[in-house]
């Protein structure tokens, strides 16, 4: 924080936003005061209700971390910290709708992502095979229908991804890159190493520099998010300007011609298929004469996608 203030805010007269990703197990009062003082936005990783979360997130003694995380989420709420939640959905999660019901009940903004395949992790915990994708297809339909019903009932929706993506369909916005990795954001780890995004943190060979020596621009160009129009594997895909080219970390880990990469692309298309179905239902609902008096606040989608 002090380095960023000195080098970027004071010397270069630029604004900086501080973001912190945490597993949510070590948050205390001093940290919360620091977050508020420095205007941090904190993302807490939690994968769902206790049974789901504790299947993956455990302490060294094997005890699940859910209760500790839940306690600290309440602390963040009471402390006035700007924070959100992030769920990682693994093949072990066979009750997707229950997971999203849990997050909506928390009444905290959240996002989700599917596990990233990696040869350094147990594939049973990260890889969705053909049967897993078939199951996810059905369950994603249930989840999107749930959000659609909430929206029609003018209930609050806390899932940032659903709101943002429906708004993108409504405004016909085009996604030229998948994310801001290495473009307008960098991640720094506890050793002072820079990475384009959090998904690369575990992989030293994806480092693009460090606090002491600065940024290696050639490596930054290699690992930052790419323009989807430059990606040969995306050129014939109908969802390329919705997806933006998918995760750059996975592209390097899997290889964009691999079977695993193609499976990942299939999952992304399934997700957008269900989002498009939800968008069509919402438009039909708005245009139905019997529902004309029910004004749906699209502005909240714009705020969520900002």
Labelled PLM ranges:
Residues 1-42, 46-52, 60-68, 87-98, ...:
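Canonical radical SAM enzyme core domain
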Residues 134-168, 198-244:
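C-terminal accessory region of radical SAM enzymes
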């Amino acid at each position: 924080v002090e380095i960023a203030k000195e080098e970027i805010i004071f010397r270069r007269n630029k604004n900086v936003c501080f973001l912190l990703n945490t597993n949510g197990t070590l948050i205390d009062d001093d940290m919360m005061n620091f977050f508020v003082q420095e205007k941090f936005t904190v993302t807490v990783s939690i994968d769902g209700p206790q049974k789901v979360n504790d299947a993956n997130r455990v302490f060294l003694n094997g005890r699940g971390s859910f209760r500790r995380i839940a306690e600290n989420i309440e602390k963040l709420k009471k402390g006035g910290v700007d924070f959100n939640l992030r769920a990682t959905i693994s093949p072990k999660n066979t009750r997707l709708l229950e997971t999203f019901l849990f997050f909506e009940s928390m009444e905290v903004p959240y996002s989700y992502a599917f596990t990233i395949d990696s040869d350094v992790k147990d594939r049973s915990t990260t890889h969705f095979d053909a049967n897993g994708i078939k199951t996810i297809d059905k369950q994603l339909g249930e989840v999107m229908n749930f959000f659609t019903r909430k929206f029609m009932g003018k209930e609050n929706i806390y899932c940032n991804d659903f709101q943002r993506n429906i708004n993108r369909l409504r405004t016909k916005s085009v996604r030229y890159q998948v994310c801001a990795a290495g473009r307008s954001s960098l991640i720094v780890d506890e050793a002072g190493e820079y990475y384009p995004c959090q998904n690369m943190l575990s992989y030293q060979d994806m480092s693009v520099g460090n606090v002491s020596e600065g940024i290696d621009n050639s490596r930054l160009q290699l690992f930052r998010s790419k323009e989807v129009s430059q990606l040969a594997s995306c050129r014939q895909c109908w969802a390329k300007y919705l997806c933006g080219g998918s995760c750059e970390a996975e592209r390097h880990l899997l290889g964009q011609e691999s079977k695993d990469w193609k499976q990942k692309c299939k999952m992304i298309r399934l997700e957008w298929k269900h989002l498009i179905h939800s968008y069509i239902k919402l438009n039909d609902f708005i245009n139905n004469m019997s529902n004309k008096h029910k004004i749906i606040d699209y502005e909240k989608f714009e705020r969520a996608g900002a």
